[in-house]
């Protein structure tokens, strides 16, 4: 009879606690930098069962998953699956997870601010960066409503004046 493994409800994966009751691809997708498609590719390349729960995996399988991404490469997958293609400094394709991804993104934003590119200026001003509309959305602070044109304001004041003078009854 084989040794019965105990089910792990919380699994430590890439320095992050992941729910062990989830199926392996969905649990891997909970890690920052790994989406569902990337998780499926990892599970397929490692030969794991995609229908098993993460808590059912042995410690060796979990180590195998972590070691698969330690060199920042996913072996035998197309380049378009990487989340950092053609790195600015090294020029190589990488796949980053957790704190590495956060670090690289923060450095990219700081570099853009330093060279004062359009994106860097937008980041430093706290405005939208990717060309979204800013006239009506993304307002911060106490700005509420829309400013009316002078013609519309004059027409509204005239209507108020007519309503107030015409609505009063004269007593005599």
UniProtKB/Swiss-Prot annotation:
A GO term for molecular function: rRNA binding
Stored InterPro entries: Rbsml_uS13_C, Ribosomal_uS13, Ribosomal_uS13-like_H2TH, Ribosomal_uS13_archaeal, Ribosomal_uS13_CS
HAMAP family: Ribosomal_uS13
Record organism: Sulfurisphaera tokodaii (strain DSM 16993 / JCM 10545 / NBRC 100140 / 7) (Sulfolobus tokodaii)
GO BP of this protein: translation
Domain of life: Archaea
Biased composition (Low complexity): 134-163
Family stated for the protein in its record: Belongs to the universal ribosomal protein uS13 family.
Keyword Ribosomal protein: yes
Region feature Disordered, mapped onto this chain: 131-172
The protein's assembly and partners: Part of the 30S ribosomal subunit. Forms a loose heterodimer with protein S19. Forms two bridges to the 50S subunit in the 70S ribosome.
GO cellular component: cytosol; small ribosomal subunit
Protein name: Small ribosomal subunit protein uS13
UniProt KW keywords: Ribonucleoprotein, Ribosomal protein, RNA-binding, rRNA-binding
Function: Located at the top of the head of the 30S subunit, it contacts several helices of the 16S rRNA. In the 70S ribosome it contacts the 23S rRNA (bridge B1a) and protein L5 of the 50S subunit (bridge B1b), connecting the 2 subunits; these bridges are implicated in subunit movement.
Keyword Ribonucleoprotein set for record: yes
């Amino acid at each position: 009879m084989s040794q019965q493994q105990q089910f792990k409800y919380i699994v430590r994966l890439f320095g992050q606690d992941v729910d062990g009751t989830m199926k392996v691809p969905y649990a891997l997708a909970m890690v920052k930098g790994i989406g569902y498609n990337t998780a499926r590719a990892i599970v397929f390349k490692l030969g794991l069962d995609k229908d098993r729960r993460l808590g059912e995996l042995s410690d060796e399988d979990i180590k195998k998953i972590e070691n698969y991404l330690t060199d920042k490469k996913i072996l035998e997958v197309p380049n378009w699956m990487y989340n950092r293609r053609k790195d600015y400094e090294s020029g190589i394709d990488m796949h980053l997870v957790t704190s590495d991804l956060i670090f690289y993104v923060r450095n990219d934003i700081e570099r853009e601010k330093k060279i004062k590119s359009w994106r860097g200026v937008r980041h430093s001003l706290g405005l939208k960066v990717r060309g979204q509309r800013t006239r009506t959305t993304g307002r911060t602070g106490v700005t509420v409503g829309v400013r009316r044109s002078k013609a519309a304001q004059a027409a509204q004041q005239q209507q108020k004046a007519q309503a107030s003078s015409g609505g009063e009854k004269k007593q005599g």
